[in-house]
UniProtKB/Swiss-Prot annotation:
NCBIfam families per record: pdxH (TIGR00558), PRK05679.1 (NF004231)
Note accompanying the cofactor annotation: Binds 1 FMN per subunit.
Function statement: Catalyzes the oxidation of either pyridoxine 5'-phosphate (PNP) or pyridoxamine 5'-phosphate (PMP) into pyridoxal 5'-phosphate (PLP).
Binding site for substrate: K58, Y115, R119, S123, R183, L184, H185
Group of enzyme by EC: oxidoreductase
Name recorded for this polypeptide: Pyridoxine/pyridoxamine 5'-phosphate oxidase
Gene coding for it: pdxH
Gene source species: Rhizobium rhizogenes (strain K84 / ATCC BAA-868)
PANTHER family in the cross-refs: PYRIDOXINE-5'-PHOSPHATE OXIDASE, PYRIDOXINE-5-PHOSPHATE OXIDASE
GO BP annotations listed: pyridoxine biosynthetic process
Lineage: Bacteria, Pseudomonadati, Pseudomonadota, Alphaproteobacteria, Hyphomicrobiales
Transmembrane segments: none
Subunit field text: Homodimer.
Keyword Translocase: no
Pathway annotation from the record: Cofactor metabolism; pyridoxal 5'-phosphate salvage; pyridoxal 5'-phosphate from pyridoxamine 5'-phosphate: step 1/1; Cofactor metabolism; pyridoxal 5'-phosphate salvage; pyridoxal 5'-phosphate from pyridoxine 5'-phosphate: step 1/1
Length: 206
């Protein structure tokens, strides 16, 4: 795909951000060599200092963007405290970026249970064994915990840990960016005051 292939009419005239995101993600799934659903997640601590890390988007619809994590981790604690977060997708193969930010809610137990059951058995054991974001004396301590939980759940199903679930970001803004020559990029932002509100679309200077 050439850098001039996408014209302004290809996406800047779209009025439904979730449909536009779905289309862009589908294209990324066909062109990105690794994890097209990888996204930078930004949170802030109690002092207002930001933290950012990569996570995997595990679902989205008109209600928001979903990912899963250990709620006792740094990001889990910061989100539970602040109830706000931001994301940034960057698809180098497509020369595109999507930024969003908004309010965060916890997914239902049913939704978390259903996703948890789809994870590899080793990943489900890891959710029990890892005290995410806390000091680790050495690799052996982690491997020992994995062995202990593997033995504990050798027979039958592995339940979802009470500290492991999902968050849904209900976006208040979503910005779509596409690279153009000479830094004259296309940028369109969708904004709303509340998660249930109507979108306002604004074209932005690059």
């Amino acid at each position: 795909m050439s850098e001039n292939e996408l014209t302004s009419g290809d996406f800047t005239e779209q009025n439904e951000p979730f449909a536009l995101f779905a289309a862009w993600l589908r294209e990324a799934e066909a062109t990105e060599p690794n994890d097209p659903n990888a996204v930078a997640l930004a949170t802030v601590d109690k002092d207002g200092l930001p933290n950012v890390r990569m996570v995997l988007l595990k679902g989205f619809d008109s209600q928001g963007f979903v990912f899963y994590t250990n709620f006792e981790s740094q990001k889990g604690q910061e989100i539970l405290s602040q109830k706000k977060a931001a994301m940034c997708f960057h698809w180098k193969s497509l020369r595109r970026q999507v930024r969003l930010r908004g309010l965060v809610e916890v997914v239902s137990d049913k939704e978390a249970d259903e996703y948890y059951k789809t994870r590899a058995r080793g990943s489900r054991i890891g959710a029990w064994a890892s005290k995410q974001s806390r000091p680790l004396e050495g690799r052996f301590a982690l491997e020992k915990a994995v062995a202990e939980y593997t033995a504990r759940y050798a027979l039958g199903d592995i339940p979802r840990p009470p500290h492991w679930s999902g968050f849904r970001i209900r976006p208040l803004s979503i910005e779509f960016w596409h690279d153009r020559p000479f830094r004259l990029h296309d940028r369109v932002e969708f904004r709303r005051e509340v998660p249930e509100g109507a979108w306002e679309k604004v074209r932005m200077y690059p």
